[in-house]
Amino acid sequence: MEGGCGSQWKAAGFLFCVMVFASAERPVFTNHFLVELHKDGEEEARQVAAEHGFGVRKLPFAEGLYHFYHNGLAKAKRRRSLHHKRQLERDPRIKMALQQEGFDRKKRGYRDINEIDINMNDPLFTKQWYLFNTGQADGTPGLDLNVAEAWELGYTGKGVTIGIMDDGIDYLHPDLAYNYNADASYDFSSNDPYPYPRYTDDWFNSHGTRCAGEVSAAASNNICGVGVAYNSKVAGIRMLDQPFMTDIIEASSISHMPQLIDIYSASWGPTDNGKTVDGPRELTLQAMADGVNKGRGGKGSIYVWASGDGGSYDDCNCDGYASSMWTISINSAINDGRTALYDESCSSTLASTFSNGRKRNPEAGVATTDLYGNCTLRHSGTSAAAPEAAGVFALALEANLDLTWRDMQHLTVLTSKRNQLHDEVHQWRRNGVGLEFNHLFGYGVLDAGAMVKMAKDWKTVPERFHCVGGSVQNPEKIPPTGKLVLTLKTNACEGKENFVRYLEHVQAVITVNATRRGDLNINMTSPMGTKSILLSRRPRDDDSKVGFDKWPFMTTHTWGEDARGTWTLELGFVGSAPQKGLLKEWTLMLHGTQSAPYIDQVVRDYQSKLAMSKKQELEEELDEAVERSLQSILRKN
């Protein structure tokens, strides 16, 4: 990421850390190779690949790097293909050849055992309660995305393209065909430009088609329902449907056509089994850094991620995609405002939309498109939540195409609402600058009407800086009872070029081991008194060897706060049996702006979070100006 942790890569103007992973399982090797040539050039790469029996694609985010794939090799096996690796390495034109290891990535579509298979031929618009909640399926009237207001203002997603990174989309579907962007689509599983889902008897590969319909299903055509941004274009990026994922396929997907695709929607991630700690590898991190730095003509690609379906047994801060600063992590609520049974909670979630996962009423699910021209009422999971958010962001982009990836995060914080959301476990709290948040729902449910109105007048936020706020490097034991409490006092790099005054994201980069990792609980409190739960108990995680190795736990809960002062880290165990642990490292990474981000913004609603934040910034600037004047007078005397 954009600061120091683990080993570091310098790419696209960003210094970011490579997450370190360890596993006791035997590695799986795929038919994909990362190849670096001494002399960069696509013609030479094609020639080299052809001579060795490989297909080839250039990686757009790095010079000299190519994706070689061999269709004659098994897609996954336990042993390396040393013959092909050595054959490539002996070629004098090749600088490096690395066979890609495979790893698991799972779709986040929750499936209830009592789900009802209903295919509707009639329009489903009246059943799309997440667009207009009138109380359908015993829902709470008014608890929806407020798209009506955005549509009435004339914003329907026109001119915006959303890429669905998934198992493909049925681009022949009559509700999707008109809005399908073929030029921005690709199949990385089959290496061709036709990302159509692979047929299975159980319709397992319907996931991407359902997500696409939520975003871009056409309006007023008497087919299925209506997309959140029904005049937007949708691109299919097929990359999930294979035995194992590889770093090179993830990176290629995330970096695909960043000048054509505005928003990338991902409803997948590491296995949600409550015991996995995993995230993007080196190439994917590099691709994401390149995307936020160079995508959309330098305004930055917008990555929307489903926060996870592991429920109370998991923590989405153990998912390096959902907890990345470069993604907008989205959780879900059901139609009456309660949490879904599969919802994971963590401090990195920015906001929420809607799905199902608690009610047996079939109409409480998400209505959308399905395979082979069909419709469905049963889409669910945070898989359904992320595309809804992508649709809302498309509406905001139509209102203001100059929005950067960071602008979109600021707008999300400022316009999301508590509404009638109810978390039975975690209370709603206010941070040090008065912004209300929840550990599961983030800053609340997206409000499309409020977002497009604010986006119209929005001025790009100031430059972002990164500061290492301090570090604890001496090993400290975590007691079986009680807590290990550590403090770091920081000036947030004040007086230096990278001073951070107004926070956006905060990372606690931690190396720690425990006799049972799942019983470990980590909290961090800011100088302004905001407590973030960085890691909650995961009862299924029995790990006693790997722990966390330079893992960047992230919080958005201190958004807008002053980073200067004393930060407190607390580590303890929650569980029935006594455990022991050792904290080896804690590094505090601060990310934000030097100047006030909202002081120049236009305020239309004087009851809004923007009005409150701007008022506070003006008061703080005045106080600091008075303090500087007093110090100047004292020095003269």
From Swiss-Prot:
Cysteine disulfide partners in this protein: C224-C375, C316-C346, C467-C493
Secreted found in the keyword field: yes
Domain Peptidase S8, first and last residues per copy: 128-452
PROSITE patterns from the UniProt entry: P_HOMO_B (PS51829), SUBTILASE (PS51892), SUBTILASE_ASP (PS00136), SUBTILASE_HIS (PS00137), SUBTILASE_SER (PS00138)
Residues annotated as domain P/Homo B: 460-596
Location in or out of the cell: Cytoplasmic vesicle, Secretory vesicle; Secreted
GO annotation, biological process: enkephalin processing; insulin processing; nervous system development; peptide hormone processing; protein autoprocessing; protein processing; proteolysis
Keywords: Cleavage on pair of basic residues, Cytoplasmic vesicle, Disulfide bond, Glycoprotein, Hydrolase, Protease, Secreted, Serine protease, Signal, Zymogen
Protein name as catalogued: Neuroendocrine convertase 2
Natural source organism: Mus musculus
